[in-house]
UniProtKB/Swiss-Prot annotation:
Residues 102-224 form the MPN domain. This is UPF0758 protein PST_0473. The keyword Glycosyltransferase does not apply. It comes from Stutzerimonas stutzeri (strain A1501) (Pseudomonas stutzeri). GO terms for molecular function: metal ion binding; metallopeptidase activity. PROSITE patterns: MPN, UPF0758.
Amino acid sequence: MSIRDWPASERPREKLLDQGAAALSDAELLAIFLRTGVAGKSAVDLARYLLAEFGSLRALLEADLDQFSAHLGLGPAKFAQLQAVLEMGRRHLAERLRRDSALESPQAVRDYLKARLRHEPHELFGCLFLDAKHRVLAFEVLFHGTIDGASVYPRQVVKRALAQNAAAVILTHNHPSGVAEPSQADRQLTQRLKDALALIDVRVLDHFIVGDGEPLSMAEYGWM
């Protein structure tokens, strides 16, 4: 049966317009993105099939072009469309973050860092550079690979803070394993960076670790 033959209240697009996007299942949201199905499958059937093939919506969103295009109903055009949608979401969060003080919008900080780092397959270390009113000046990824005391250089963080004319910074890195618990090395690194940045009167306000779920704030746990 075609989706056109379904009751209006059950059609994904009409359901979204009536109840909002949050009311839709992963399959219904994906069906709206797909727009059409394939022979023998409606858009919703195809969406359910793809979610089963990938294992989760997250895995589908994180797939590279080859992985994505290997599945029924998908190809380079859909991949490009999906990447554009994801990037618009990231830019929306970044713009929202820049409008307000980072300290007055802690959830906006979490949302942005989660969108920026959670899906990265390798460890990244970055900084949110803030002005004297704690408004965001810029976000920069500074280091790639294993994030420990040997791979993150305080002098490079200091150099970028000076270049941005920052008054404060929020540190962040991701744990691709999904476990957002700080290691002893994470705590030692945070202290080294605090000490280095204090020499140029730049405050470290927090260090967020991004894994599955909500990013962990080291400041909230008293680990700063």
